[in-house]
Each structure stands twice: as structure tokens, then as C-alpha cells.
Amino acid sequence: MKQKFSTLFFLLLFLFSGLQVVAQKAPGPFDIEQPSLRVFLPAPELATGRAVVACPGGGYSHLAVDHEGYDWAPYFNKQGIALIVLKYRMPKGDRTLPISDAEAAMKIVRDSADVWNLNPNDIGIMGSSAGGHLASTIATHARPELRPNF
């Protein structure tokens, strides 16, 4: 039994001796110093005045802004809905950072409603993964004037 174990151990050691471990960063932006919004407006003939603020996920360590943000724009725009993707700061121990960024996004979208041809009373929020947590936090804990309509 000892010999089988030793043989198996050395066989595995030999097989993995050439294995190289390479550290990779998770996809998406890191160390966002300044939050930002990217606005995707529908064609004027399709526009309904409705908008959705999208909060991408990423486990509060990075943002998956492409597949959980920007890639949704054509879907919403074809339905006449503006999509506004929020790049929020990572908390790094301060949970108020992403919350304040999302609250500011809601205020900016409402304040810019005339410029973007939006109805300030028809602004929603959505998110994926950690972004979904952020969206639900804004929907339930923000001051009433900063909460989404849906």
C-alpha cells in the first residue's frame, strides 16, 4: 500500500512539475476613483421617457460593466428606454461609497431629465449581483427623492 501511494504521489508530482500558476485580475474596471455615468438614449421616434440606471456587479471588488452594463443598452433602447450605466466606486471597507454614488446617479438622471428627454417620475434602477444589492439598497433605504420609481 505504501509503495502504491508513493508511486502515485511521485507520478502526480512529475505530472504537475511543469504547471505554472499565473495570477490574473478579474475582468472589469478596478480602483475607480471617480464615479461616472454612461448614457444610452433610444432613437427619438422610440423614446418613451423611461430610463433605467444599471449597476453592474463584480462582488464589490471590480465592475463587470460590459456584460452587466453596456451590453444591455440595445435591448432597452429598442424598447424606447434609456439605459444609464453607473460606474461606482468600490467600498474598500467604506460601504457608503457605492451607495452615495448610486444616490448621486439618481439625482443626476432626474436633474438631466429635460436634456435627455426623460420623465423624471419614470426612472428605475437595476443591478446584477453586487449591483443588484446596491440597486435594492437604493430602492429601500435612500431618501424618498433619491429612490427609483421602479
What are these regions (language model features)?
Residues 48-57:
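Short beta-strand element of the alpha/beta-hydrolase
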Residues 64-71, 86-120:
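Catalytic nucleophile-loop/oxyanion-hole region of alpha/beta-hydrolase
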Residues 36-48, 114-116:
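Short beta-strand-to-loop junctions in surface cap/lid or active-site-entrance loops
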Residues 56-61, 129:
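Active-site glycine-rich loops that stabilize anionic/oxyanionic intermediates
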Residues 51, 77-87, 124:
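A fold-wide structural signal in alpha/beta-hydrolase
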Residues 1-24:
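Bacterial Sec-dependent N-terminal signal peptides
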Residues 104-150:
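Primarily recognizes the serine-hydrolase "nucleophile elbow" in alpha/beta-hydrolase
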Residues 24-25, 41, 125, 140:
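Ligand-binding pocket scaffold of soluble enzyme catalytic domains
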